[in-house]
Amino acid sequence: MEKLARKQVQELTPYLSARRIGGTGDVWLNANESPFNNEYKTDFARLNRYSECQPKALISAYAAYAGVKPEQTLTSRGADEGIELLVRAFCEPGQDAILYCPPTYGMYAISAETIGVERKTVPLTSDWQLDLAGIESNLDNVKLVFVCSPNNPTGNLVKREDIVSLLEMTKDRAIVVMDEAYIDFCPEASTVDLLAQYPNLAILRTLSKAFALAGLRCGFTLANEELINVLLKVIAPYPVPVPVAEIAVQALSEAGLARAKFQVLDLNANRAYLQVGLSMIPGLQVFEGWGNYLLVKFPDGDALFKAAWDTGIILRNSPIENCVRISVGNRDECEKTLGFIRNYYS
């Protein structure tokens, strides 16, 4: 049956999520999930009815949290669907292109490749920042420029002045899509305030990370009202199930926000603990991280990754040579991981 598939799909290499890769163990630090398992109440009495396309309570709650108007907010099945909607809505297959800066999140490329949209890449500089000159020279036919900050997998923040320069550079030419999936761990670095000045800015958000709701699949796109209305033309009729909307609204309540803030503080402290401990091991390079993960360069990254895997510590291998990404778990998970790595190099 594969021969009946579209040519692009036949040639497509799927994104290998942490769950697809699998593994067995008791320390799971491979998917940048939160270690907190919070409880919520759900009303199952309305499951015979379809959900609203854009549940008003959810849109209002997230808009208030993000500091934007409800008209500037769209909710979807995770930020991944937001990526797909942007590509489908703004890119003509065989004509337009997206641009992204590796090493970075893999779904930008997959979403474009799936529908036959060209992918242009301008690698990050040696310190993981934007190569603005390289981007400018590759903007022909580009409709979307994806920038992840904090960047996955490197963990760094993209310089704000470079983001502003990029927005100026792409005015009336392309949309800059800021992927802020991890911004709740460093909210002061958000670009949400730039929405008022730049109509060519879109921002992706999620409840998967800081809100500990990876299994819920609830994300958001923030942009000007005109851009949001374009996305509403191509979104599925019922993208957010009733239980998802109900749980998300609880997470965005006053009590839910207070809990998320406390848990972010806890995870940031664990990240600092892990960063300091790893930095003291000779031969390791620990890159500064602003999300709930750290990128670490080992003398022999593949061997370290496999050894950890074999002992039940599941980390995330990286396409960057000898680098492994380590999610920040609870203190016990961080201690076990740090202890294993110390012993491995002792």
Swiss-Prot record:
GO terms for biological process: L-histidine biosynthetic process. The modification N6-(pyridoxal phosphate)lysine is found at residue 209. It comes from the Bacteria. Pathway: Amino-acid biosynthesis; L-histidine biosynthesis; L-histidine from 5-phospho-alpha-D-ribose 1-diphosphate: step 7/9. It is an enzyme of class 2 (transferase). It catalyses: L-histidinol phosphate + 2-oxoglutarate = 3-(imidazol-4-yl)-2-oxopropyl phosphate + L-glutamate. GO terms for molecular function: histidinol-phosphate transaminase activity; pyridoxal phosphate binding. InterPro entries: Aminotrans_II_pyridoxalP_BS, Aminotransferase_I/II_large, HisP_aminotrans, PyrdxlP-dep_Trfase, PyrdxlP-dep_Trfase_major, PyrdxlP-dep_Trfase_small. PROSITE patterns: AA_TRANSFER_CLASS_2 (PS00599). Its EC number is 2.6.1.9. Its cofactor is pyridoxal 5'-phosphate. Keywords: Amino-acid biosynthesis, Aminotransferase, Histidine biosynthesis, Pyridoxal phosphate, Transferase. Belongs to the class-II pyridoxal-phosphate-dependent aminotransferase family. Histidinol-phosphate aminotransferase subfamily. PANTHER family: HISTIDINOL-PHOSPHATE AMINOTRANSFERASE, HISTIDINOL-PHOSPHATE AMINOTRANSFERASE-RELATED. Homodimer. This is Histidinol-phosphate aminotransferase. It comes from Vibrio parahaemolyticus serotype O3:K6 (strain RIMD 2210633).
